[in-house]
Amino acid sequence: VLIRDAEVEGQRRDVRVEGHHIAAIGRLSLRPGEPVIEACGGALLPGLHDHHIHLAAVAARRSSVQCGPPEVTDAEGLARALQVPGSGWLRAIGFHESVTSGQLPDAATLDRMVPERPLRLQHRTGRMWLLNSRALDELLAVAPPPPGLEHEGNRYTGRLFDEDAWLQQALGSVPPDFAAVSAELARFGVTGVTDMSPRNDPVIARHFAQQRAEGRLLQSTVLAGALAMADAPQSGWRLGPLKLHLHEAALPDFDEALAFVRAGHAQGRALAVHCVTEVELVFTLALLDAAGSLPGDRVEHVSVASPELVAQMVNLGLHACVQPHFIAERGDRYLADVEPQHHGDLYRLRTLLKAGLALAGGSDAPYGSADPWRAMAAAVSRTTPMGAAIGPEEALTPEQAMALYLADPLDLSRQRRIAPGEPADLCLLDRPWASARSRLDSGDVAVTIASGRLVHQRVDQTPFERLARADSPA
C-alpha cells in the first residue's frame, strides 16, 4: 500500500507499507497494481495505543444499563433507569453513591426498584456489585457465599466487594466477543491495547488469542494480569506487567504483597499498581523501595500525588499511566469529595513530565471514555463538566497529550515513530496537524491501519484506489 502525500512529522511525504511494516518514506513512485491512499496533506501518525483498558468489561457494557452520573443523578432517576422490559438478569453499571444521597443501597432498597428479576448493579470503580434479593437467591443457590459478600448478623446486605471471579463462576459467564469494541477503537485510530485486568489468567489469555486469530480483535494486544500469565502460550498477544490492584480500605499484608512483587520481578515482569489515593501511592512506594524497582515498574492513575511523592517516584525510576479525561468526566465530583488542600495534587500531568517520569495514557474503559482524543483534549483543557479548572498549571500541549498514546507499550520511555522497519500501525487524519491540534477530535480520523491491514476508513470518503494507469508502463 502506498500512502501518498501525507504529513509526517511536519513534512509532506509518501509512505509505503509492505506486509506488517513500513517499508519506505520519501517521494515514492507508484508501483504497478499498488493500492493507494490519497492523504491530501493529512497528518499521518503512529497508531494510538491505549495503555490501560478492560476489554471484557467494555464489551459487557454494551448489554448493560447506565445507572450513574451524568445520565442518572438521583434515586428517582435510578429507579426509572432500572425499569427495563424483559426477564432474567439485569446488569447495570456506573453507579455512584451520590445518586442515593451518599448511601450504598442494600438488597431491600433495590428490591423496591426491581422486585421481579435478579439485578446486579456495578459501582463506578468496578470493585463492587450491589445485588437485589432475587440475585442473592440465585447466586447462593449455586455457590457458597464468598468472603467479600457483606452481611449484618445473619442477613446478607447484597453488597459484594472484590469478588468478580466468584460472580463470574456463579453466573457461568463466558468471555464476550470483542469485535464491536475493537471496531470502535479502530475508528478512534487505536491500533494497540494493554488490557490491565488484574484477574487476567491463562484462560482469558486463550480467549484473547482466539479473538486475535479470528480477526475479531484488530489491535495488537499486551496482557497484564496475574503471576500465572507468565506460563500461558503467547499467541497473538504479548506479556505485560504483573497487576496489583490496591484498595485503601483493605490494603494487603505488606510482606505478602512484597513476596508477590518479588515473584513478578523474578519472572522478568514489571509491576503495575492501581493507585487512586495518597495512601495507596505511599504503600506502593514503600513496597517498591523494599523490593527494589525493575525498569518498567509503573503506577496506574496517580490520582493524588504530592510533590514529595512525585520525587520518590522519580527516585525509584517509575513510569506512570494517566487518565486525563477523568477531570473532564468527574472533575466536579472530585472538587466536592476531595479535601481542598489536595485539589492541586489531582491527576497531575505537567509536574510528572517535568520531573522526568515516562508517561502513557490509558482510558480505563469502561470506567472512562475509550476515546483517546477526549483524553487528549482534557489534558490540554483541565476543565470539569461544569467548566471549573483543576490544576490548570498541569495542562499539557497538544503534542505532549498526543505523546501519551504514542509510547511503546513494553517501554513507556520510548516513543513510537513512523520510520522504515517500524510496525505498520498508522492513523491518518483528514487534515494537517496544525488544524487537528486545536480540535483533538476523533472525528478527524480518516483511516486506521493496524499491522499493515486497513481496519477503518471513514464512510464519507473512499481513500483506497487502484490506479489503472499504473498497471502498464506509459
For each feature predicted by the language model, list its residue ranges.
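Extended hydrophobic/aromatic segments used for targeting, binding, or gating
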Residues: 209-240, 311, 442, 451
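His/Asp/Glu-enriched, well-ordered alpha-helical/loop segment
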Residues: 262-272, 279-297, 301-302, 307, ...
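A structural microfeature
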Residues: 23-24, 446-447, 456
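Non-cysteine beta-strand/loop elements that form the S-adenosyl-L-methionine
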Residues: 54, 236-247, 318-328
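A cross-family glycoside hydrolase active-site/sugar-binding cleft signature
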Residues: 93, 122, 195-196, 220-226, ...
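Glycine- and charge-enriched low-complexity intrinsically disordered segments
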Residues: 457-471
